[in-house]
Amino acid sequence: MQLIVVSGRSGSGKTVALRVLEDLGYYCVDNLPVNLLPQLIVSVESQYDKLAVSIDVRNLPVSADKLETLLAQVRNEGRVEFSSFFFDAENSTLLKRYGESRRLHPLSRKQLSLDEAIREETNLLAPLSSTADLRIDTTSLSIHDLSELIKTRVLGKKENELVLVFESFGFKYGIPKDADFVFDARFLPNPHWIPELKPFTGKDEPVARYLSSQPDVMQFILQIENMLATWLPHLERNNRSYVTVGIGCTGGQHRSVFIAEQLAGAFRLLGKNVQIRHRTLDKSTPQH
């Protein structure tokens, strides 16, 4: 049976995630007390082959060690194919979402301000965040974008296979929080300053032809490829479900896009399960 544990800070998109997983055929349980997870698995494994469970900050064990031990037990005992998704967003975004929805934060009963509750929740959920197979930052995602991203991650994954995600981005918009590795391409030649190349992206032939003619660019790609190829077997043996590689340039339109596309193509040729995302291009904004 496949099991996905959904967690994250309140307001970050857990409810949307659970709704998408239900549409994908998962039997979903919202806000399950963590200590009931082993019993739930036993009770439903003969009826369902896909289970998704949402864990809320209100239903955590008192001890963080107990939480880590319980999840490790479920992950390692072999009854389920275990994956965990952690959803998050910037504090300012969470504050804005709560202001718009006028909902109470789950920790508001502790007589904390909203800002204090959000920060306290961060500490309480740290064990789930640090051990998640996939972290998704929803700060700049619409509900539709988040739904499509979850579908891509879930449907694009084969059983017990590591998914390698290449993600281009612009440093001017911030580093993606879901990245396991981040590479900075801002020192490389920038097509933005070449008038005839500026309107294009790293997916277009004129930019690709220019960047592929730059020795530093190609050496940078080769060295990233060699590093990942060296360590991916170790990550696979460690039962990782996802590895997200962030490639950043100034605005996320030219260099980072080209490099992410080149790396994705190289690892597809090696038979890896590869997904690609261009954060700036996906917003459809003309940044460089």
Curated annotation (Swiss-Prot):
GTP binds at residues 56-59. ATP binds at residues 8-15. The keyword GTP-binding applies. One of its GO terms (molecular function) is GTP binding. Signal peptide: none annotated. Pfam families: PapZ_C, RapZ-like_N. Keywords: ATP-binding, GTP-binding, Nucleotide-binding. Transmembrane segments: none annotated. PANTHER family: RNASE ADAPTER PROTEIN RAPZ (PTHR30448:SF0). Displays ATPase and GTPase activities. Belongs to the RapZ-like family. This is Nucleotide-binding protein ASA_0318. It comes from Aeromonas salmonicida (strain A449).
